[in-house]
């Protein structure tokens, strides 16, 4: 997904599993240390904004890194028109606005983002996300609220499904996720949250004829509901979350959905998101990045639309090479590696090669029996040299002719 937007601030929520889509500047999230280069080194670099200024012969003052201006005043950007693309949505028109401020000079920037998206497939997405920091970053409050009308594909359960099994599920949904984290040590946080997900007007559209679908076997109902507290752990040593060149990231979310909170039946889930970034070679600006994303149903039976699935992570980035929703099951394990390298010395152009593998448990045995690999390559175009935000254009391949274009603002992980 991509948002063509030149604003400085967006927000990235790390609140839990994701079944409600988001089409905004997701990966170009607010960084906890926005100043990623000195003015001298930044001005040696080139980005899209520099090129546009040169083309229009801009006489505006020399650009500054607005991310280092620590003001308590709320700065608002927008509304701004934009455009996006994903395999699930096709092209999309977007209107977005965001704001930022510093609660204290010694705190990370607090940010808010909202948008309205209408897609070529008649889908509607309206998120509101916020990330607030207190003095000395002692507390972090994360909010992720969304409304969607999002008809999209499902292919059934497990790893043996085929592309011909696919059909549309029509639904509307809201999610109300929020969490409060407290600093335990440098770069380490833990806290508690509350997540509510509600789906309604769920219906199958032109399912395979003369066949009982996996959704019907699993339990097709016109509504799905999940409510529960979350227990969160976060460890993040990256200096730049938009385009990391080193460090580690670990995010663990345990979510018990108990009947006392209105669930039809109790079920529990666990998400473990781990990433590592290594400069390779060490003296270069090239980066070797690894990502592990495991999404497990510990016990009980999750609603069908809230089960682990391809592209079901918070920013719909797992499984490049396959359409989101291509595989689905009670448990998912995922691993990806990517090599990111410069093409031009001025940083304007870069490239990547990547490979991933995902596996889902079979419904009948609850065992992992198949692996779906994905692989591909892509280009990077530097949009903002101060935050190192790239426009990412990747083409991914999967098994049995699967493939497509994957577009992001910022790195995939």
Question: Where is each model-derived feature located?
Answer:
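Bacterial Sec-dependent N-terminal signal peptides
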Residues: 1-20, 278
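Outer-membrane beta-barrel initiation region
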Residues: 15-142, 219-245, 330, 343-350, ...
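Transmembrane beta-strand segments of outer-membrane beta-barrel domains in Gram-negative
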Residues: 17-20, 26-59, 65, 153-282, ...
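Gram-negative/organellar outer-membrane beta-barrel architecture
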Residues: 69-78, 83-225, 326, 389-392, ...
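Transmembrane beta-strands of outer-membrane beta-barrel proteins
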Residues: 77-79, 110-114, 139-143, 190-192, ...
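Sequence/structural signature of outer-membrane beta-barrel proteins
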Residues: 100-104, 117-123, 148-152, 199-201, ...
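Flexible, surface-exposed loop regions and adjacent strand-edge segments
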Residues: 159-163, 206-215, 268-271, 304-313, ...
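C-terminal outer-membrane beta-barrel translocator/porin domains of Gram-negative envelope proteins
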Residues: 240-344, 349
């Amino acid at each position: 997904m991509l948002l063509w937007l030149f604003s400085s601030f967006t927000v990235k929520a790390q609140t839990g599993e994701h079944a409600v889509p988001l089409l905004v500047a997701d990966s170009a999230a607010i960084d906890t240390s926005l100043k990623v280069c000195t003015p001298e080194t930044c001005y040696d670099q080139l980005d899209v904004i520099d090129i546009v200024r040169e083309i229009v012969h801009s006489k505006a003052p020399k650009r500054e890194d607005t991310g280092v201006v620590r003001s308590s005043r709320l700065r608002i950007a927008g509304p701004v028109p934009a455009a996006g693309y994903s395999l699930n949505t096709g092209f999309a028109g977007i209107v977005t606005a965001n704001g930022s401020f510093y609660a204290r000079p010694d705190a990370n920037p607090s940010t808010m983002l909202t948008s309205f998206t209408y897609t070529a497939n008649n889908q509607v997405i309206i998120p509101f996300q916020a990330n607030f920091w207190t003095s000395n970053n002692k507390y972090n409050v994360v909010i992720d609220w969304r409304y969607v009308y999002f008809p999209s594909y499902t292919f059934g359960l497990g790893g043996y499904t085929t592309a011909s099994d696919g059909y549309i599920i029509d639904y509307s949904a809201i999610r109300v996720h929020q969490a409060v984290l407290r600093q335990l040590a440098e770069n380490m946080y833990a806290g508690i949250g509350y997540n509510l997900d509600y789906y309604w007007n769920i219906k199958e559209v032109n399912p395979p004829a003369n066949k009982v679908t996996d959704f019907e076997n699993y339990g097709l109902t016109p509504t799905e509901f999940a409510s529960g507290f979350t227990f969160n752990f976060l460890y993040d040593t990256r200096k730049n979350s938009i385009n990391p060149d080193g460090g580690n990231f670990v995010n663990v979310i345990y979510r018990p959905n108990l009947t006392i909170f209105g669930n039809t039946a109790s079920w529990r889930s666990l998400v473990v998101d781990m990433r590592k970034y290594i400069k390779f070679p060490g003296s270069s600006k090239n980066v070797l990045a690894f990502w592990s994303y495991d999404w497990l149903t510990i016990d009980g039976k999750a609603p069908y639309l809230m089960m682990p699935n391809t592209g079901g992570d918070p920013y719909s980035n797992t499984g490049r090479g396959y359409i989101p929703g291509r595989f689905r099951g009670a448990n998912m394990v995922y691993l990806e590696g990517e090599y990111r390298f410069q093409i031009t010395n001025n940083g304007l152009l870069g490239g990547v090669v990547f490979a991933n593998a995902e596996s889902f448990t079979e419904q009948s045995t609850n065992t992992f029996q198949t692996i779906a690999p994905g692989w591909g390559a892509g280009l990077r175009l530097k949009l903002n040299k101060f935050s190192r935000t790239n426009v990412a254009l990747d083409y991914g391949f999967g098994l049995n002719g699967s493939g497509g274009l994957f577009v992001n603002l910022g790195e995939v992980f």
